Amino acid sequence: MITNKKIKISVPEKLGLSEESFEESWETVKYAIDHIYSDDMADLSFEQVYKTIYTIVLNKKGPILYNRLKDYLIQKLALLRETIVKDNTHDYEFLGTMARLWEVQCHCFKITGDLMMYMDKVYCKPNRCMEVYDMCLDLFRIEILQKCSSSLISALISDIERIRNLGSVDSEHTSLWKVLIGMMETLHDNRDSFFLTDFEPVLISATEEYYNKAIDIELLTPIESLEKIRKLRQFESMLDSSFLNVDSHNKLKTVLENVLIWGKLSDIIEDLTHEAMVISNGKLLQEIYDLSSEEKYRVTVIESIKSYINKNAINIPFNEGNRKKGQNAITWSSEIVELYRSQHSFLESIDFGSVRLNNLTGDVSNAILGDVFSMYFSKEGALPSEYLSTYVDHCMKRTKEKDAEIVKIKQDLLDSTKLIGLLTEKDIFEKIYKKQLSRRLLQQRSLVEIEKWMVQMIKKVLGTFFTSKLEIMLRDISLSSEMYQAFQHSTINSIEYLSFAPQVLTRTSWPFQSTNPIDEGISLPPRMSQILAGFEGYYSLKYKERVLKWAHHLSVIEIGCQFNSGYYEISFSVYAGVIFLLFEDYEELTLGEIYELTHIPIDDVKSLVMSMSTIPRCKILKKSSSSGNMKFSVNYFFSSPNRKVKVPVIACPLPSQKSDNLATASSVDTYDNEIVMELSAIIVRIMKTEGKLSHQQLLERTTKRTQSRLSLTPSILKRSIQLLIEKEYIQRNADDPSYYHYLS
């Protein structure tokens, strides 16, 4: 019976018979080896054997003993090999035989090595020979393992695949494999272990081939394929960990990843990802994402997520058309904001790890949405900028409703600012937003507190450059409100039946021409002229160095009037209101007479009077014809379901061709001047830093600074440079005019 009890051998006190011949001594050693191999060591005197080996080595016979032992072990191993090969009738039985043989031989080698320890110390080490135990292992490798390698590898691979087919880990089999793998890892040649050089490559190749055939994606749905692959990977991982070392286990993981994920799932990753997002299944999407930790795979999943969101964005129609453009803008923007909101909420539940996206690390969900929507907006041109501004305008006006849900409106606005920051045409958004904000503020169509909050939100995503004038507009409204309160309590504002609410605006910050040519000669009713003169006097006392210039085309007048059907409050543009007030003193007037009394151009008079006499909802004038001359008078039979009636406000009321050209030119010139001033400030900052630059260098740096804000044209740049030269901020180089110097 083989025992694991350690054998203790003491150094002999006497050498015994010195004349003992080597052959006789060898017979003693051989006898001991035979009994070790037959597991019959009960009557064996280990002390006597050790003395014999000690004497042989001491008498310089170590090389002979070493070689004789090696030859004898080869004979024994060869005999064992023939028995194994002869009995090799079944794979699993063969594996069991090999495992038992290995364990028995290791035990025999260990005892033999212990007996030869003196030879190891005195002969093997000085002569750089393998110690006896190592020599025994090497002989086993040569005589057993190498000569049975093909049968062993084939049997082991077959048994592994048999267990894979069963789909259940069998501990009896895996324990056997672990012994054999341990044997292969123990036995080395000059290169590496048998496991690494001979078995592992075959195992990897066989595993790859097995899993290539294990699943047919075409016969399964994407979800079924994912579930099948998940089970295969889970089982293989459990199986491999039961008999392989960590390095080999990881190599097989890579094989499965290449075969099952890149080879099988690669064509349906997008379909899988889209399906998970359609049903908003975060757990499923996380499983898809975690199938591989390789960055290339994870970026592929992220690109699939992007394609799904982009497809949904594209499916939201713009419905371009002038008839319902405002409603189209609100509908489109609402759906886009909801898409962004829902996808942001969904993606925040996914753990994306530390994947790099567009060379950036951080919040992957925000990066995904940023990439998708910025790319989408860039392809659609100016419409997203226009529509989102209109959507914000719609939300702001809702804040004035009686049952307004302010919290929900603010959330809608907050979500819209995230999209505003992704717009390509930010300058277009700024222009439209500024115009819409001006209307809301002047017509009091929104809550100023919400307007201020929204400008701060926009400032966070676009920067101060885009919001500086918006902040000035809001400041103007706040200061005007304070001024109105003070003016109300002054003795100047004491005209009966007349309430005046002034808005003092900074001319360069509001998005319209500051004056209208009509305003120069218009003749206002006496009470209006008196109140305006009173405010001018009040303002000049408060701000002595400032000059007021009235912009009637931006103003609104409300007049209360008693008709036969009741009392109505009618809202006009100042021009229309001036005309209507004439009928306090006149029963009827012709167009010419109205012109003479107001000095409003005749074409504009005609347009304003026609709007008050033909539009059904505000038909407050009636017309009559006598002797071919059209006359107008108050229509006392006017009625409306609403007490408040609004005559369409015309900011610039259909002026004559001449005045129209002047107004348009003024508007364009004002905008260009604003751009020149902004650009000049940027150039000054650049030149102050650089000191000296060529024209081309200045152009490149200025373009880089302004590319996200405005479209830089050569004419605007030229005007800005010329302005700075005139104001002595910069000067041209005297020797080379293409260079500029900063003047401190």
From Swiss-Prot:
Pathway: Protein modification; protein ubiquitination. Neddylated; enhancing the ubiquitin-ligase activity. InterPro entries: Cullin (IPR045093), Cullin_CS (IPR016157), Cullin_homology (IPR016158), Cullin_homology_sf (IPR036317), Cullin_N (IPR001373), Cullin_neddylation_domain (IPR019559), Cullin_repeat-like_dom_sf (IPR016159), WH-like_DNA-bd_sf (IPR036388). Residues 677-736 form the Cullin neddylation domain. Pfam families: Cullin, Cullin_Nedd8. Component of a ubiquitin-protein ligase complex consisting of the cullin CUL3, the linker protein ELC1, the substrate receptor ELA1, and the RING protein HRT1. PANTHER family: CULLIN. As part of the CRL3 E3 ubiquitin ligase complex; polyubiquitylates monoubiquitylated RNA polymerase II subunit RPO21 to trigger its proteolysis; plays a role in global genomic repair. Belongs to the cullin family. This is Cullin-3. It comes from Saccharomyces cerevisiae (strain ATCC 204508 / S288c) (Baker's yeast). The gene is CUL3.
